[in-house]
Regions:
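Flexible, low-complexity junctional segments that flank or bridge functional domains
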Residues: 1-207, 218
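Short, conserved loop/helix-junction motifs that constitute active-site signature segments
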Residues: 212-215
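Short, intrinsically disordered, charge-balanced linker/junction segments flanking boundaries
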Residues: 226-229
């Protein structure tokens, strides 16, 4: 059997619960310690002093949000009915470098929409596909139709600027149309215990080539600081 820690529904109890969840389940504590000196035990002592069982829900929310900010992780959020505590310094601390006006000029208004794909043919017979997100479905049929319509183009631009990510499966479905062979894309480890270094052995991740329409000509991928996740 597995022992499950229980905590009182008080500011102190909720603080303890959240700190321990991060301490035992968050994957990157050792990496953050090496990268910028994060010490999660020091974080505990620093923020424990700010907790009082008489504080308001909003006050507790603010302290817990500040504590999570120490992780410097845009994927770590705390939700409440009145607000979402988030870490957005990775993008708010930098000037925007993607102009929707310029992009709209090239995409125009007479473009095709196939699920998450926006496509058109630019001057000089260059195909253009804008992928603003991979949060919504990119189906095999969508890709068949899109690539077939651009088949006579002499080259292709895939624009993922401003793409805030989403579902890895949809990204792989798109990428599989641009390789004729199996490609090693990375490695993954799974958390196996409560210790900061408790991970499985790395497992290789491969992208399989699609058995449907694949692009065989030149292709250019446009990215920017907002292409992530």
């Amino acid at each position: 059997c597995t022992k499950v820690e229980t905590y009182e529904d008080t500011p102190t109890g909720n603080f303890e619960a959240l700190w321990h969840i991060i301490d035992t389940k968050y994957c990157f504590l050792d990496y953050k310690a090496e990268e910028y000196g994060l010490n999660w035990n020091t974080v505990y002592r620093r923020y424990k002093r700010k907790i009082d069982d008489g504080m308001s829900h909003a006050g507790l929310f603010d302290v817990l949000g500040e504590m999570l900010d120490e992780l410097r992780d845009g994927h770590v959020n705390l939700y409440a009915a009145h607000d979402v505590a988030r870490y957005w310094d990775f993008r708010e601390g930098y000037a925007a470098n993607f102009s929707e006006e310029v992009q709209a000029h090239y995409l125009g208004t007479d473009y095709k929409i196939a699920s998450a794909l926006r496509s058109t043919i630019l001057p000089d017979n260059i195909g253009y596909i804008y992928v603003p997100s991979v949060s919504s479905s990119i189906g095999e049929g969508n890709l068949d139709e899109c690539l077939a319509a651009l088949a006579l183009c002499r080259g292709l631009i895939i624009d993922v600027r401003g793409n805030g990510g989403g579902n890895l499966h949809y990204a792989e479905t798109l990428a599989a149309r641009f390789t004729n062979e199996r490609v090693l894309t990375g490695y993954i480890c799974h958390k196996t215990g409560t210790g900061h270094s408790d991970f499985s052995e790395p497992q290789a991740l491969y992208l399989e080539s699609s058995n449907r329409i694949r692009w065989q000509k030149e292709v250019c991928v446009l990215t920017d600081r907002s292409s992530y996740s």
